[in-house]
Amino acid sequence: MATILQHLPTGQKVGIAFSGGLDTSAALHWMKLKGALPYAYTAHLGQPDEPDYDEIPRKAMQYGAEKARLIDCRAQLVAEGLAALQAGAFHISTAGVTYFNTTPIGRAVTGTMLVAAMKEDDVHIWGDGSTFKGNDIERFYRYGLLTNPALKIYKPWLDQTFIDELGGRAEMSAFMTQAGFGYKMSAEKAYSTDSNLLGATHEAKDLEHLSSGIRIVNPIMGVAFWRDEVEVKREEVTVRFEEGRPVALNGIEFADPVALLLEANRIGGRHGLGMSDQIENRIIEAKSRGIYEAPGLALLHIAYERLVTGIHNEDTIEQYRDNGRKLGRLLYQGRWFDPQAIMLRETAQRWVARAVTGEVALELRRGNDYSILDTRSPNLTYQPERLSMEKVEDAPFSPADRIGQLTMRNLDIVDTRAKLGIYAKSGLLSLGSGAALARLQNDDPS
């Protein structure tokens, strides 16, 4: 039996990741009418744009689900989000502004926890709303099969019969209305939004055009800081970490990481912190564009990175950043639980995060405009007296020590000059006019 089913398996249990939106509502009711036994599973991810989570399973039952369950994924989502933070698992950035991989983290949690819930109900066929052009179809495929090796995949959006009958949103709305549910399409936005409590993604439609930008977006986790009429006041904030874990905001300790992140979202959101506009490579290598929000993670990231740079040495920081970019790509590709990702993540959590204890004070202004006001940690290797321009007692090194250190540099300076001479003789370098520095020649042998 094929892993991916191209036609509806009638008479069998079919699990569907049910959001309560038009697409999954129409798909669920259509599967019921065609003879399948739909089971609906909804992930509670703390979506900031979802007003009533408990209503979603009730809708699924009305539309024909044999069973509908709401799976609380918030604790696991925050745990994975903080693991990504500790490892710096973020590979997409533009001019120093970071995308925090909030959607890939959400898919890792959703893909595993929903399929695990389906196994409890003896459901081994799974469908979701991802399209064939996106990243999620591969992420869910990988996480689903990792969780249940017997899993089969059925997606209505890959079934030509479903496409022929309900190929667009207008057809789906008419189908639901005709079935007596009175379903009305929500007003079409100029873009689509996907969110969880870690962050929000705005993409597609008008945002596919690079001539459109952040100004058409209505933030759901913060304020439109680019609008002059939006008042944003300066705010001082403190963030405290213990062994790599954020534990306090503004002096208030949080035993529950979910509660801490929600408060971080509120603080960062008041300023529009963590919004970014990114062009990225999808898994299939085609480029896409998204506008992202992640106010809480952005706040924690600033404080965490400040402590990392004050505590660890240069080589450790280099490995942390290099491995973080590699891990970010693996996370983006749906490989968060692959052995190579676990190796990189565990290394950072053990040898980088464990030493990160301390408190950072910041002043937040508009958007990503902030200043660091203070950094305190018992583990700081930053010690100003080591490099003070004033006289200090028991100085760690003397002028004579530095003379000796510089003299040792003569060895590699001599070697470097010799190499430059070799390159000059071979025609790769020439002396610049009026200067003793070598210049690169044209590498064209002709």
Swiss-Prot record:
Q: Which GO terms describe its cellular component?
A: cytoplasm
Q: Which reaction does this enzyme catalyse, per its entry?
A: L-citrulline + L-aspartate + ATP = 2-(N(omega)-L-arginino)succinate + AMP + diphosphate + H(+)
Q: Write out the annotated subcellular location.
A: Cytoplasm
The EC number(s) given in the record are 6.3.4.5
| Main localization (coarse) | cytoplasm
Signal peptide limits: none
- InterPro entries hit by this protein: Arg_succ_synth_type2_subfam (IPR023437), Arginosuc_syn_C (IPR048268), Arginosuc_syn_N (IPR048267), Arginosuc_synth (IPR001518), Arginosuc_synth_CS (IPR018223), Arginosuc_synth_type_1_subfam (IPR023434), AS_cat/multimer_dom_body (IPR024074), AS_multimer_C_tail (IPR024073)
What pathway does the annotation place this protein in? Amino-acid biosynthesis; L-arginine biosynthesis; L-arginine from L-ornithine and carbamoyl phosphate: step 2/3
Instruction: Answer yes or no on keyword Ubl conjugation.
Output: no
Which residues are recorded as binding L-aspartate?
T131, N135, D136
User: What are the recorded GO MF terms, alphabetically?
Assistant: argininosuccinate synthase activity; ATP binding; protein homodimerization activity
Q: Name one GO biological process term.
A: L-arginine biosynthetic process
The residues the record assigns to binding L-citrulline are Y99, N135, R139, S192, T201, E203, E280
Q: Which domain of life is it from?
A: Bacteria
Where ATP is bound, by residue?
A: A17, F18, S19, G20, G21, L22, D23, T24, S25, A43, G129, T131, D136, D194
Q: Which UniProt keywords apply?
A: Amino-acid biosynthesis, Arginine biosynthesis, ATP-binding, Cytoplasm, Ligase, Nucleotide-binding
Instruction: State the HAMAP family in the record.
Output: Arg_succ_synth_type2
What family does this chain come from, according to its entry?
Belongs to the argininosuccinate synthase family. Type 2 subfamily.
Quaternary assembly:
Homotetramer.
Q: What is this protein called?
A: Argininosuccinate synthase
